[in-house]
A protein has these predicted regions:
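A glycine-rich, Thr/Ser-enriched phosphate-binding loop motif common to dinucleotide/cofactor-binding enzymes
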Residues: 118-137
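Glycine-rich phosphate/diphosphate-binding loop of Rossmann-like nucleotide-binding domains
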Residues: 137-149
Length: 149
C-alpha cells in the first residue's frame, strides 16, 4: 500500500472550532498560542483505490496561519514545516505534499526535503504537467500540430 501525507497551514477559525472558548479571543492572541503548538494529525485518509494500487494518507496541520508564514522569521517557519513533515515520516508516509503557503516559504521545499527522509513535493511539477496537458489538448481541439503551432 502506498502512503502519503499532506501538510497544510491552519486558520484561526480552525482553533476556534476545536476549542469554542477561543471564539471570544482576539485573532492575534490565538495566533500567538498557535506558534507554540506542535504539528498534529488532522485526519487519516483511507479507501483510496484504483485498479492498480491502494493508498492511505494523513492530513497534517502545520499550526501557523498563512499570515504567520509570511511574517514570522523564515527559519522559524521552515522549522515548523520540517516538524510537520517529520510527523508525516513517523506515520509512515513515503511522500509529503506541501500545501498552500507551506510550499512558498524559503526555497520552495528544498530545505524541507533535505531535513526529512521522504520525498517532498510542492505541487509545482503537477501544475506544470497539467498546464502542458491542457495546452496539448487545446492545440488538438483547434486542429493544429503542436510542433508547428
Amino acid at each position: 500500500m502506498e502512503k502519503f501525507a499532506f501538510v497544510h497551514p491552519l486558520v484561526v477559525d480552525d482553533f476556534a472550532r476545536k476549542f469554542p472558548i477561543m471564539r471570544y479571543l482576539p485573532d492575534s492572541w490565538i495566533e500567538g498560542a498557535m506558534k507554540h503548538v506542535k504539528s498534529f494529525k488532522i485526519s487519516h485518509i483511507t479507501g483510496v483505490r484504483s485498479p492498480y494500487a491502494e493508498a492511505e494518507g494523513w492530513f497534517i496541520a502545520c499550526p501557523l496561519t498563512a499570515r504567520q508564514m509570511v511574517t514570522l522569521p523564515e527559519e522559524y517557519v521552515t522549522g515548523k514545516i520540517i516538524e510537520a513533515c517529520q510527523l508525516a515520516q513517523d506515520l509512515g508516509a513515503k511522500i509529503v505534499g506541501l500545501g498552500a503557503f507551506t510550499s512558498i516559504v524559503g526555497d520552495a521545499g528544498i530545505t524541507i526535503a533535505k531535513n526529512v527522509d521522504i520525498a517532498v513535493t510542492s505541487g509545482n511539477s503537477y501544475t506544470v504537467a497539467t498546464a502542458l496537458q491542457g495546452t496539448r489538448e487545446a492545440v488538438r481541439l483547434m486542429g493544429k500540430d503542436l510542433a508547428t503551432a
